[in-house]
Amino acid sequence: MIKQLASASTLALALVAQPAFAQDARTTFDGFYVGGAVGLENVENGTKGLEFDTNRDGTFGDVVRTTTNADAFSPGFCGGQALGNSAVAGCASDNDKFGYAVRVGFDKRFGDVVGGLLLEGANSKAVDYATGFSTTPASYTYARSIDYSIAARARLGLSPGDGRGLLYATGGVAYADIDRAFTTTNTANSFTLDDGGDEMEWGWQAGGGAEILLGSNLTVGFEYLYSKYNDDSFVTVGRGTAPATNPFLLNGGATDLRPADRKIDQHAFRVTAGFQF
């Protein structure tokens, strides 16, 4: 998919490079266009940490207990990446990364109002972390990132005056490849991601932006885009080399764990460029 996005981006740049005389001059947002965007991507940093299903009945929210009925995760949780095997070491924040997107769309002008549809492919490497600390001591970190996404959005905006400026809102559906990874300093138990660490998920997007139509049918602008995806994945903690008295094994022989925040919330702040046909 990454190669496809790169190819589409190259095609878009090639179209932009066409001589101005080969295209009809455009003075308003009305017709087909291709474009791209690049900017900073941020995954919302929650503080909920992890949650557990100790009897694997599908209901999360259980407390992992030791043989003395103490809370095995009493040291606490954080919404970041563990910096050591204990809560004292603390956590790093989620990783913000630069992402890019390519798109093709169509706008129709009705007086000062512009409405349209677009298809977009995007790539992002921003990472969301959720961590828990046990009394062992040991750390358990669940990482999630959006590898790539495909979206179909509508946009509606105002383009008053000479029609060379556009303020718009946008929203629609998205389908994303969510990458997951799990790391821990616990070397006794076994840990298995339920989906192998990679799964497609549906979500939605909403945002807004502004564009200016320059000469030679070129547009530039900026855009904010919010994306939200569901995530039902989890990690199964098995016995490994741990004794039967291990807290993860006491209530059914295994425990499932996952981020307490099941939603993935992403914010993108982009600079855009396009070419109007």
Region annotations inferred by a language model:
Residues I2-T10, A14-F277:
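Gram-negative outer-membrane beta-barrel domains
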